[in-house]
């Protein structure tokens, strides 16, 4: 994998998103967990509602760079086929898992439209816009959200509310979120500024602190926009409303900026040494970062995020499938914490082993 894709900051962010997904999915089935630690039933926003957008944002951080590298090495046709296969595979895997869920529930209810299907369709939609500049992606993503919101309010509301993650129509909104987030990431990371409007050509920088601050600043702008528009359009994860997308993009950008700049930071700067052991000249002093065990733990998870997400669904089944209420639904807090730590421990052991063996499982 390339240096961009294997950026420790992005791996840590991916890992954080997946760990939080495991937390949300496990405790969603526990009866005594308070409402603010579960998804809002419809209109409203809880801290859990931002977890899926965190992973969408993590995908957006490398989508554009990965697409451009693939174009350079494989050409446009092979690149398009590669990305179509990747995201179509997510839809297919998600459908198989959803069918298995229906089978275990003995056919009760409709087949679930899961996170993997939503990400897969969003990725396919975003692929149509990856060849455009970040500024065009920002505009296109915004237009998609506007059109989706109109269709939602006039035609799709009942269908979307009857489906998890908004069903197929909701995936259009997730796609708009991914397109906008990729535009933000490429602008700040320095891709596309050559085609930016004259007054905006100096957005990008390679300075880590400044990059982090710009993600935070961009995030706060989107948070303010989402909160303001929320007075007109309900903020709802279940509806995947435009205001939910805008607010979630903002929160995700702020969290990424904070995490990449300071989370687990022990040391920020120092002199690097060249291969012969001599100190670099003052003009070549390079900043570096050293991280503690918590952030290293997240890097393990972030190396194979999709694989660990799929795997956690099977491990979660050990606790969620038995029907005895005391075992899961009404589990004692101590038992629930033990079960959650067991799931995290198993997955961390696997994540660490894959990391140490330098195994990366891609679709």
Question: Which residues fall in each region the model found?
Answer:
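Alpha-helical transmembrane segments and their immediate juxtamembrane cytosolic regions
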Residues: 1-363
């Amino acid at each position: 994998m390339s240096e961009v894709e294997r950026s420790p900051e992005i791996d840590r962010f991916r890992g954080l998103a997946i760990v939080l997904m495991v937390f949300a999915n496990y405790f969603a089935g526990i009866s005594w967990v308070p409402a603010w630690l579960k998804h809002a039933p419809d209109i409203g926003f809880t801290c859990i509602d931002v977890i899926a957008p965190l992973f969408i944002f993590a995908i957006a951080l490398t989508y554009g760079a990965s697409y451009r590298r693939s174009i350079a090495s494989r050409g446009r046709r092979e690149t398009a086929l590669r990305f179509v296969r990747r995201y179509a595979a997510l839809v297919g895997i998600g459908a198989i898992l959803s069918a298995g869920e229906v089978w275990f529930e003995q056919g009760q209810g409709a087949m679930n439209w899961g996170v993997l299907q939503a990400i897969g369709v969003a990725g396919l939609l975003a692929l149509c816009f990856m060849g455009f500049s970040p500024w065009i992606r920002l505009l296109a993503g915004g237009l998609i959200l506007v059109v989706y919101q109109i269709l939602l309010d006039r035609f799709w509301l009942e269908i979307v509310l009857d489906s998890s993650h908004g069903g197929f129509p909701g995936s259009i909104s997730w796609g708009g979120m991914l397109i906008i987030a990729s535009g933000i990431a490429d602008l700040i990371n320095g891709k596309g500024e050559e085609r930016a409007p004259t007054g905006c050509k100096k957005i990008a920088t390679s300075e880590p602190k400044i990059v982090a601050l710009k993600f935070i600043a961009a995030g706060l702008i989107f948070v303010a926009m989402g909160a303001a528009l929320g007075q007109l359009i309900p903020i709802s994860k279940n509806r995947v409303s435009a205001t939910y997308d805008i607010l979630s993009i903002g929160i995700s950008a702020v969290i990424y900026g904070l995490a990449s700049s300071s989370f687990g930071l022990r040391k920020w700067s120092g002199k690097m040494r060249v291969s012969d052991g001599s100190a670099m000249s003052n003009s070549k002093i390079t900043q570096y970062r050293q991280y503690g065990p918590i952030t290293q733990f997240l890097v393990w998870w972030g190396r194979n995020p999709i694989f660990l997400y799929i795997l956690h669904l099977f491990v979660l089944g050990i606790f969620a499938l038995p029907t005895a209420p005391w075992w899961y639904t009404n589990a004692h807090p101590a038992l629930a914490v033990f079960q959650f730590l067991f799931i995290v421990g198993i997955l961390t052991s696997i994540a660490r082993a894959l990391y140490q063996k330098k195994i990366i499982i891609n679709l």
